[in-house]
Amino acid sequence: MERSRRKVLEGLVVSDKMQKTVVVSVETKSKHPIYRKLVISHKKYHAHNDNDDAKVGDLVEITETRPLSATKNWRVSKILERAR
């Protein structure tokens, strides 16, 4: 039996002040159920950044993982685009 698939999200690094941790803001778009207007919502995730190579402004891919601390349940899997 195959292991369950882990969630993968894309987001922008908004903070790298902590050691081996970055805060990633993930944007989701959905339509309002009644008014059918496009609603954009943001959610911040604390992600483990083992090599400290992701910086503020980078576009990263984060993967769900086991709890690493009280707030960290995600890990930076790859850096998609560097900040200018």
Curated annotation (Swiss-Prot):
Protein's gene: rpsQ
Could you tell me which species this protein originates from?
Answer: Ureaplasma parvum serovar 3 (strain ATCC 700970)
Query: What GO cellular component term, any one, is given?
Result: cytosolic small ribosomal subunit
Name the Pfam families on file: Ribosomal_S17
Q: Which GO terms describe its biological process?
A: translation
Q: Which NCBIfam families match?
A: PRK05610.1, uS17_bact
Keywords, A to Z, come to: Ribonucleoprotein, Ribosomal protein, RNA-binding, rRNA-binding
Provide the family line: Belongs to the universal ribosomal protein uS17 family.
Tell whether Translocase is among the UniProt keywords: no
User: What protein is this chain from?
Assistant: Small ribosomal subunit protein uS17
Query: What's one GO MF term for it?
Result: rRNA binding
Q: How does it assemble?
A: Part of the 30S ribosomal subunit.
Q: Which CDD domains would you find in this protein's record?
A: Ribosomal_uS17 (cd00364)
